[in-house]
Amino acid sequence: MVNAEEQQYLNLVQYIINHGEDRPDRTGTGTLSVFAPSPLKFSLRNKTFPLLTTKRVFIRGVIEELLWFIRGETDSLKLREKNIHIWDANGSREYLDSIGLTKRQEGDLGPIYGFQWRHFGAEYIDCKTNYIGQGVDQLANIIQKIRTSPYDRRLILSAWNPADLEKMALPPCHMFCQFYVHIPSNNHRPELSCQLYQRSCDMGLGVPFNIASYALLTCMIAHVCDLDPGDFIHVMGDCHIYKDHIEALQQQLTRSPRPFPTLSLNRSITDIEDFTLDDFNIQNYHPYETIKMKMSI
């Protein structure tokens, strides 16, 4: 049986290769790009977890980065200590100097995702400052509203803060999401769905990671709110393939997607900050081998 949900990702990759607009980009690599393709939709029901199978996705990196966001952390060295290097380039001394952040210590990424999720509107000093009680804790507010007012239409998590963009090592690509609680009329359990808007979508490296990350966040919030996961919907703006990824993606397109794995959470948790790596159990993940692609910065 064809994995139709992963196939929609592969179909979009093929469409961009065939029809994408040739565009320059900030990194100088060059891209093929389309704008506002049809959203991707993934069911999270029955413990299904949308971890792409046509190449191996670094799930430990997905989990640890998300836990780092949830803690409100912005120091890439904390991830490097766990042998996760996805933020190394943007936190390097050379890169920070190149964008004018010469006074930042190496690894200090500025007020990026986690800071905005937990302290939106607070004044960013550095990655070592304690910001407890400062700014708007969007994540805590969402969880509280889901528990007390599940029909609320303001279950919004935004990483896009125009006042802070120049302080960030990299402005947020996955920038805004909305949660929705489905209250069934029958005896079924309520479900939590999430829709993400991503302004800049690197189809080769970033998007497979982002799909897994926001699906995981949805499952975690559902778990602490005693809901079942529903759907994850991925809405994309500038959806692009870096030219030096085309060959690798053409290789990936030759692979037939396999069934998605399942995700189980190993213990009862009511505080989202209590999750650790050991709480996530990915089963029946049988991907093809890794396909390496270079990150453009």
From Swiss-Prot:
Gene Ontology CC annotations of this record: cytosol; mitochondrion; nuclear periphery
InterPro entries xrefs: Thymidate_synth/dCMP_Mease (IPR045097), Thymidate_synth/dCMP_Mease_dom (IPR023451), Thymidate_synth/dCMP_Mease_sf (IPR036926), Thymidylate_synthase (IPR000398), Thymidylate_synthase_AS (IPR020940)
GO biological process: dTMP biosynthetic process; dTTP biosynthetic process; methylation
Reactions that this protein is recorded to catalyse: dUMP + (6R)-5,10-methylene-5,6,7,8-tetrahydrofolate = 7,8-dihydrofolate + dTMP
UniProt EC number: 2.1.1.45
Gene3D superfamilies the UniProt entry points to: Thymidylate synthase/dCMP hydroxymethylase domain
Molecular-function annotations in GO: FMN binding; phosphopantothenoylcysteine decarboxylase activity; protein phosphatase inhibitor activity; thymidylate synthase activity
Annotated pathway: Pyrimidine metabolism; dTTP biosynthesis
Residues the record lists as binding (6R)-5,10-methylene-5,6,7,8-tetrahydrofolate: D202
Keywords for this protein: Methyltransferase, Nucleotide biosynthesis, Transferase
List of residues binding dUMP: R26, R153, R154, R199, S200, C201, D202, N210, H240, I241, Y242
Active-site residue numbers: C173 (nucleophile)
Subunit record text: Homodimer.
Entry-linked NCBIfam families: PRK01827.1-3 (NF002497), thym_sym (TIGR03284)
Family the entry assigns: Belongs to the thymidylate synthase family.
HAMAP family: Thymidy_synth_bact
Name by which UniProt lists this protein: Thymidylate synthase
